[in-house]
């Protein structure tokens, strides 16, 4: 769904664990990392799109997560000119996103990047809460800063345990 201003309706998903960390995923075959996100289909609510994208991108079902909150309004970013497909109609100049903060209720092993058969991501890890703001591709940075600021009090209040000392291989950064 592309609106009259050229922005595609999209949902963004931030998954947090009991340590106050967030899931950070690497785009398939690329060196860029981001939160899961995806388009809202015609006739689909933002929440329905979030659950669909959650399964398609990271293999999680509604029973694996709890919705903590969502953004009060849609947040927008423009695509760099080199990424705008001028030959498509209507032309999409960026994304308008409704963001959801989810708490993971299941074990990390429930995360499956290949659940849809067309993986969006090829790796993931837990990172400190503010890490993504510094690391995301530049044209998404302002939206990430806004959403992380809006969600900070809620996300960080759900930290129920200290991060364990490293024992063996762990997927953590930041």
Swiss-Prot record:
<feature type="domain" description="Nudix hydrolase">
    <location>
        <begin position="6"/>
        <end position="149"/>
    </location>
</feature>
<feature type="short sequence motif" description="Nudix box">
    <location>
        <begin position="38"/>
        <end position="59"/>
    </location>
</feature>
<dbReference type="InterPro" id="IPR015797">
    <property type="entry name" value="NUDIX_hydrolase-like_dom_sf"/>
</dbReference>
<dbReference type="GO" id="GO:0005737">
    <property type="term" value="C:cytoplasm"/>
</dbReference>
<dbReference type="InterPro" id="IPR000086">
    <property type="entry name" value="NUDIX_hydrolase_dom"/>
</dbReference>
<dbReference type="Pfam" id="PF00293">
    <property type="entry name" value="NUDIX"/>
</dbReference>
<dbReference type="InterPro" id="IPR020476">
    <property type="entry name" value="Nudix_hydrolase"/>
</dbReference>
<keyword id="KW-0378">Hydrolase</keyword>
<dbReference type="GO" id="GO:0006402">
    <property type="term" value="P:mRNA catabolic process"/>
</dbReference>
<dbReference type="InterPro" id="IPR020084">
    <property type="entry name" value="NUDIX_hydrolase_CS"/>
</dbReference>
<comment type="similarity">
    <text>Belongs to the Nudix hydrolase family. RppH subfamily.</text>
</comment>
<protein>
    <recommendedName>
        <fullName>RNA pyrophosphohydrolase</fullName>
        <ecNumber>3.6.1.-</ecNumber>
    </recommendedName>
</protein>
<comment type="function">
    <text>Accelerates the degradation of transcripts by removing pyrophosphate from the 5'-end of triphosphorylated RNA, leading to a more labile monophosphorylated state that can stimulate subsequent ribonuclease cleavage.</text>
</comment>
<dbReference type="InterPro" id="IPR022927">
    <property type="entry name" value="RppH"/>
</dbReference>
<dbReference type="GO" id="GO:0034353">
    <property type="term" value="F:mRNA 5'-diphosphatase activity"/>
</dbReference>
């Amino acid at each position: 769904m592309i609106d009259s201003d050229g922005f595609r309706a999209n949902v963004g998903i931030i998954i947090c664990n009991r340590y106050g960390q967030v899931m950070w995923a690497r785009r398939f075959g690329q060196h860029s990392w981001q939160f899961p996100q995806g388009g809202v289909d015609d006739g689909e609510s933002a929440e329905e799109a979030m659950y669909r994208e959650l399964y398609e991108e990271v293999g999680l079902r509604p029973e694996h997560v709890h919705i903590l909150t969502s953004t009060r309004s849609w947040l927008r970013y423009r695509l760099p000119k080199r990424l705008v497909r001028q030959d498509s109609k209507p032309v999409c100049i960026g994304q308008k996103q409704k963001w959801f903060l989810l708490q993971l209720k299941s074990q990390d092993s429930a995360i499956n990047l290949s659940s849809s058969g067309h993986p969006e991501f090829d790796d993931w890890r837990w990172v400190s809460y503010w890490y993504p703001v510094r690391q995301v591709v530049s044209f998404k940075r302002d939206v990430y800063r806004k959403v992380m600021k809006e969600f900070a009090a809620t996300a960080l209040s759900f930290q129920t345990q200290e991060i364990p000392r490293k024992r063996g291989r762990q997927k953590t950064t930041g």
